[in-house]
UniProtKB/Swiss-Prot annotation:
Result, substituting K56A: No change in membrane fusion. Still binds GTP, no GTPase activity. No longer binds GTP, no GTPase activity. Double mutant causes better vesicle and content mixing than wild-type
Region (G1 motif D1): 50-57
Residues covered by region (D1, associates with and fuses membranes, tethers lipsomes): 1-609
The protein, known as: Dynamin-like protein A
Length: 1193
């Protein structure tokens, strides 16, 4: 860079810096100053970033051959640490903008504490005469990019835009984490040199996986992302002599970078300034939030306020005009009603003629005949009048009143009943009242008569309708007055918001003017004043003394873990209790009158004794789930590896149904399953045509322009299909010895076709009836893994969530754990256990406590309160090493045993204990009745029957209760609302992440289309997971209600009554079936939004990205609302139907049980028939009750 170029650049950036400060964007002003300082000093920045706890700090210490930086398994570098060659000193930049300097000799441990203090210290610069760094070079250590602390992440991001080379460091066990690929895609285009370091390869176990195979997998992944194998290094700090350690080669590459030419410094600096300017102008326009402009919002909101005012006017008008409108409609109908048509006049004339005094008829004009004829004509005429009134008036009146009730929104069961009952009140006298006596009979008189009669009918109709109109008008006024209040309240709120938006729109316009001015400064020489100080970028920070360091080993706000400290001496002898239940059933089984009850009791005891339990393992891939499962059973049953192994659901259970120990049954997917999975993973819109599965997908590979990874994926499916076609088509199980298991669960070329593997293995754990389910990784790049795992959240009796000691609680865990947090509160008991695996890596107890405190605090952040947290070493447990301070495997086993034997079984055991007591109480009452008089027995019978009637009525009331149904409806609607809110936030974050600058690399339009497809698939997947979470929550809610209603409240009522008992059973096995949800979303729905993306420049440097994200987010929100609206009633119906089934089932069981008990009492009250049996049962119950039969909890 020439002096003249440097001077011009410094003038422009100096003016920009001034504008940034005036616009209160100190953050980007500082970045701009840092960029120009680096350019002026002609310094090379080499940054180290990657996963937190991947060993970045340890690696830097090793490269510098000195213990400079603090190291820990949890995030330690809470700020930026810059290491330079120079006179020995430390410079601290505080978060409040000051600067402190420690010159000369300093304490390393004190400096390391400053490196951990992210609250007070923003960055630390360390200078010394390091032989491993050239002058003009800075090594930069950053917090982990996947740290759960947003401040850590921002700290890392703030320096990366300045780096000349970036070394991305990952832990050996977490190479395939999805965030690796996402980060590399987002950063590789903005930094000249990107490298990938796989650290801690000392964790490699050659007996599990050959290192060459592992290396090939890593190289393939990087190659897919455009990073060459020359940029890949494998390192180990703890084992320098490790055969695969490339620390020496890494040092050589660092030396080469340090000596690289600085000829492209100006171009890189200008690009960095331009990026900062773009960010600043977006900040001015508030585009970072993706919100629409305030001018647009103002326009929309002005219309909204006017609409509310119109609604208010209309409502008030409706209140005053409802009755008038109804009356007008009724008058219109009656006016138009042809009540006395021409056809009627002949009957009218005949009737009028008969009313003449001179009217006579019959032989010799007898009076009887004349009266008979008059009645005949009167009745005929009135019948016709009544029919025509009904047809011409009543029916139309009813229809109109119905329509009016709907128009005015008062169509209720009450109003509908009132309207439907409307009839014009007609009496036969009405036709006589219209007669004008004395008038001469003529055709003109007949016409006038019919007109008068019609008017009388209309008056009657109006009078009858007036009562209905009065009721409807009152209903309208009541409803509208509520609407008016609601509209008024909203109008006040929206009017206030309108004032706010008017002010914001004004500010937004100012921001637009500022933006134009800033770009003019950068692009037009004449727009930049030339009196700017060329050393403006030099630090103007206030010099202060080094801040006081905070005391204590940790600033984490960990929650206490009381559940992990439960004393084991409280363990319950449940097996002894079960034996005692059997003893009681044997004793009472000899009493014929109690045979039905004791048989049912014995069957329930047997179900409790033989109950099966499911223990599910969750966690991110490579968290050690398979190793933990192996440690639980005591042998390497499942394969384990540093790359994701569990691509299927794997179960370990005791041998049953003739299956041999140490064998496995493999269940394959169907052709439809395979097709659906390929479509989902590749994004191919529809199933290709073809005569066979193989033909279809071979054609698809040739016809579609697929990405290389998708071609490989389909190839894997085709290989697996070809090899196991018979098993797939015929759905036959494949039985194999354990020695042949690995390909079916760990190699995608086979495992992709496997649905489930059941391993039969005899050990103490499986003999207790426990089945271990090892699920796919919760944060694996393969979405199929997590989708398969989710169903076990609901079904498992208990589950363990695994996290890795040196990489605990990464961002990949967050979404899954947040759903566990949502589910946890709905469970009737806490069945979640959290495991920190590989705790043998702990240096000492202090470090271990730091990690457990950190994990506990992070779990609490995600809604998992009071987590049951343990640290283990599956590796050491498997080889039989004695338990140490870090390996709590024996405690895990004890807690698991207690949970299964006490927490899970205690509800059933308590019910059985209560039922046993009630059986004894029945015997005691029957025994007492044997010594009562006939009168006393009769009185006892009457009390029994009254109690039976009360209890049966109570059961019916509970069975038909609507209260819980309304609660279910309310809770479902409320949860769906929150799901929509969460998905809106998720969409915003997802789209910002999906549409990154890396898309400019290659075919822009193709990359954008792919990004959209991927984002839509992820959004769809998140929606489905949210609905599944809702299913689990509602299942727990319903189960808890049934338990409270039938086990607690009803049982208490029965105990107070004294005659009857009801065994409700275990509701967990009756859980709700997860609802299948298959919403559809297509990329073509967003064609218009994609068309608006003109070019990378327009998208990233102008307002394109923010506008696009907001447009897509809003459309996704509407689509989601439509999904939810479509699902809402279906879900409510699904849940309420399940609840009604449970209530009905409970009611039937209860009625049957109390009926049996009533019959037993009645037989016992019979004179002397069962006296001997009752006496024997009585003595046996006395003996049983006197022994200790209490369940110890």
């Amino acid at each position: 860079m020439t002096d003249q170029n440097r001077k011009e650049l410094l003038h422009k950036t100096g003016e920009l810096y001034k504008q940034f400060i005036e616009n209160q964007d100190e953050q980007r002003a500082a970045k701009l100053a840092a960029v120009m300082k680096k350019a002026a000093d002609e310094e090379v920045y080499i940054a180290f970033t990657g996963h937190y706890s991947a060993g970045k700090s340890s690696l830097l210490n090793c490269l510098l051959m000195e213990n400079i930086l603090p190291t820990s398994p949890i995030p330690t570098s809470a700020n930026l640490v810059v290491i330079r060659n120079g006179e020995k000193r430390v410079r601290l930049h505080t978060t409040d903008g000051a600067c402190a300097e420690l010159e000369g000799t300093y304490q390393k441990d004190k400096v390391q504490q400053y490196c951990k203090d992210g609250e007070q210290i923003e960055s630390v610069e360390i200078f010394d005469r390091y032989t491993e760094i050239d002058s003009g070079v800075a090594y930069i250590d950053t917090p982990g990019i996947d740290s759960t602390d947003d401040a850590h992440f921002l700290s890392a991001a703030s320096i990366l835009h300045q780096a000349d080379a970036l070394f991305y460091v990952v832990h050996y066990n977490h190479v395939h984490a999805e965030e690796n690929v996402k980060f590399l895609r987002s950063i590789k285009e903005s930094i000249p040199n990107v490298y990938f370091i796989v650290n801690q390869i000392d964790r490699h176990d050659e007996t599990e996986t050959k290192f060459g195979d592992y290396q090939a997998q890593v190289e393939e992944m990087l190659c897919n992302e455009g990073i060459s194998r020359e940029a890949l290094y494998f390192t180990s700090v703890t084992e320098p002599d490790h055969p695969f350690n490339q620390m020496g080669a890494l040092r050589e590459e660092l030396s080469r970078i340090e000596q690289q030419s600085k000829s492209n410094m100006q171009a890189l600096t200008e690009q960095k300034v331009r990026n900062l300017l773009k960010e600043h102008t977006e900040m001015l326009k508030k585009d970072e939030t993706g919100a629409p402009s305030f001018a647009e919002q103002l326009n929309i909101h002005t219309g909204l306020v006017q609409s509310l005012r119109d609604q208010l006017d209309e409502a008030e008008k409706q209140m005053t005009e409802a009755e008038k409108r109804m009356q007008e409609e009724i008058n219109r109908i009656l006016k138009n009603a042809n009540l006395t048509p021409f056809e009627m006049r002949e009957l009218a004339a005949a009737f009028l003629e008969s009313q003449e005094p001179s009217f006579k008829t019959g032989f010799f004009f007898s009076k009887a005949k004349t009266a008979q004829e008059r009645d005949k004509r009167r009745n005929a005429f009135f019948s016709d009048v009544a029919k025509r009134t009904e047809a011409e008036a009543d029916w139309h009146m009813i229809d109109t009143l119905h329509k009016l009730a709907k128009v005015f929104d008062v169509y209720t069961a009450e109003s509908e009943k009132l309207i439907q009952a409307y009839r014009t009140p007609l009496d036969i006298s009405i036709i006589e009242h219209a007669v004008k006596h004395g008038a001469a009979f003529s055709s003109e008189y007949v016409l006038q008569y019919t007109k008068d009669l019609a008017e009388l009918i209309r008056k009657e109709a109006k009078r009858e309708a007036a009562d209905i109109i009065k009721v409807l008008s009152a209903m309208v006024k009541e409803r509208v007055s509520k609407d008016v209040q609601t509209i008024n309240d909203r109008l006040v709120q929206e009017s206030e918001k309108l004032v706010f938006l008017q002010e914001q729109a004004r500010l937004e316009n100012n921001a637009r003017e500022k933006t134009d001015r800033l770009w003019a400064i950068w692009e037009e020489e004449s727009a930049c004043p030339m009196h700017i100080d060329t050393e403006w970028f030099k630090s103007k920070k206030t010099r202060v003394a080094a801040p006081e360091q905070k005391q204590g080993r940790s600033q984490l706000t960990a929650q206490p873990m009381p559940k992990s400290e439960i004393k084991m001496e409280q363990e319950m002898p449940l097996q002894d209790q079960i034996k005692r239940f059997y003893t009681l059933s044997d004793i009472l089984g000899e009493c014929s009158m109690l045979l039905k009850q004791t048989s049912a009791f014995r069957e329930r005891v047997k179900r409790l004794e033989e109950r099966k339990f499911t223990l599910a393992l969750f966690g991110g891939f490579s968290s050690g789930k398979s190793s933990f499962a192996n440690a639980l059973v005591g042998e390497r049953v499942l394969p384990s590896s540093p790359t994701p192994t569990t691509a299927t659901i794997n179960k370990i259970t005791k041998p049953i149904n003739g299956n041999l120990n140490k064998t496995a049954n493999v269940v394959f997917k169907t052709e439809d399953d395979l097709t659906a999975e390929i479509l989902q993973l590749t994004g191919i819109p529809k199933e290709p045509a073809g005569r066979s599965f193989t033909e279809k997908w071979e054609k698809a590979v040739k016809k579609n322009r697929l990405q290389e990874e998708h071609v490989k994926l389909i190839s894997n499916f085709l290989l697996a299909y070809e090899k196991y076609q018979q098993y797939i088509q015929e759905q036959k199980k494949l039985t194999i010895p354990l020695s042949e298991l690995k390909p079916y669960v760990a190699e995608e070329t086979t495992a992709c076709a496997v649905k489930e593997v059941t391993v039969y293995y005899t050990c103490p754990l499986t003999e207790k009836g426990i089945t271990i389910v090892d699920t796919p990784g919760a944060s694996s790049m393969n979405k199929r893994h997590t989708e398969l795992a989710f169903q076990y959240i609901k079904d498992a009796d208990a589950f363990f969530y695994m996290t890795y000691y040196q990489h605990s609680f990464s961002k990949g865990d967050r979404s899954f754990l947040r759903k566990l947090g949502l589910v946890k509160e709905s469970l009737s008991m806490d069945k979640m256990f959290f495991i920190i695996n590989a705790a043998d890596l702990a240096k000492d107890k202090t470090e271990l406590e730091t990690v457990t405190d950190y994990v506990s605090a992070e779990l609490v952040k995600e809604g998992v309160y009071e987590p049951q947290l343990f640290t283990v070493s599956s590796k050491e447990e498997l080889v039989g090493k004695p338990e140490s301070f870090y390996n709590q495997f024996s405690k895990v086993r004890k807690h698991l045993d207690r949970f299964i034997e006490v927490d899970v079984k205690k509800a059933s055991a308590a019910q059985l204990s209560s039922e046993a007591d009630k059986l004894c109480e029945t015997v005691f009452q029957l025994h007492q009745s044997q010594h009562q008089s006939r009168e006393e027995k009769e009185a006892q019978k009457q009390c029994l029957m009254l109690s039976f009637e009360r209890t049966a009525a109570d059961i019916e009331k509970r069975r038909n209760s609507k209260t819980i149904i309304e609660k279910v409806k309310k809770d479902t609607r409320e949860q769906l609302y929150h799901i929509a809110q969460r998905l809106s936030y998720f969409a915003n974050d997802l789209l910002k992440s999906a549409f990154h600058p890396g898309l400019q690399n290659g075919d822009w339009k193709k990359n954008v289309s792919k990004a959209m497809t991927t984002a839509l698939h992820e959004y769809l997947f998140e929606y489905i997971q949210e609905i599944k979470t809702l299913d689990v929550r509602m299942s727990g809610f319903i189960e808890r209600h049934i338990n409270e209603e039938w086990l607690d409240h009803f049982q208490k009522t029965l105990n107070e009554d004294g005659y009857f008992s009801v065994y409700a059973g275990d509701q967990h096995s009756n859980g709700i079936q997860l609802k299948e949800v298959e919403p559809e979303i297509e990329e073509r729905a967003f064609e218009q939004e994609l068309k608006e993306i003109k070019s990378p420049k327009q998208f990233f440097e102008q307002k394109g990205k923010a506008t696009f994200i907001e447009a897509v987010r809003m459309k996704l929100t509407k689509i989601t609302e439509a999904w939810i609206k479509n699902e809402e009633e279906s879900l409510i119906s699904h849940y309420t139907a399940h609840l009604r089934r449970l209530q009905e089932d409970m009611g039937e069981k209860a009625i049957a049980q109390i009926t049996d008990q009533k019959e037993t009492y009645l037989r016992g009250y019979a004179e002397g028939e069962h006296a001997k049996e009752i006496e024997m049962a009585y003595q046996a119950c006395i003996s049983w009750k006197n022994s200790d039969n209490t369940i110890k909890m």
